[in-house]
């Protein structure tokens, strides 16, 4: 059972208070954002679902990320994170959508992006914001820290704080 003070619990409470829904598109977090949301009882009132778009072609075919964007910038990039969040918002029919794309490790990706480089995006009716993080080594640590950053990004938006 999660503590009520967890980031995901705070996001859940804020979504309920504001009557908004959330979805997610995950790559490097591999479904961890969705898992942490669905660990909370009653979350079906606000959580629409998620897409684990681990493969690049899924980012294109399911989320609608333009192939030209993937070719130019690669899957681990700010423009792709932005497009993933916007695609998830559209596909899942939710008010807000958060996305993660990055390099969990143990090796750099094919473009040479280092382990621990992650882009998180939040798409909302009034805009899309991206946060770039670079964190310590360890696949599990990268996944868990990235999911927490995704919840923090969402919490900040819902709380009316600066989203960065």
Locate each region found by the language model.
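Short alpha-helical segments enriched in small residues
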Residues: 3-164
């Amino acid at each position: 059972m999660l503590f009520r003070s967890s980031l995901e619990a705070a996001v859940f409470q804020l979504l309920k208070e504001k009557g908004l829904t959330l979805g997610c598109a995950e790559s490097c977090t591999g479904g961890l954002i969705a898992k942490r949301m669905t660990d909370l009882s009653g979350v079906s009132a606000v959580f629409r679902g998620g897409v684990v778009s681990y493969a690049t072609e899924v980012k294109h075919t399911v989320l609608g990320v333009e192939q030209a964007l993937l070719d130019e910038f690669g899957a681990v990039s700010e423009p792709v994170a932005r497009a993933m969040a916007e695609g998830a918002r559209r596909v899942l029919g939710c008010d807000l959508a958060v996305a993660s794309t990055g390099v969990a490790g143990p090796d750099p990706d094919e473009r040479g992006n280092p382990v621990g480089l992650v882009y998180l995006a939040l798409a909302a009716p009034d805009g899309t914001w991206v946060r770039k993080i670079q964190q310590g080594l360890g696949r599990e640590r990268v996944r868990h820290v990235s999911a927490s950053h995704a919840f923090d990004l969402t919490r900040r938006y819902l709380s009316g704080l600066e989203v960065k």
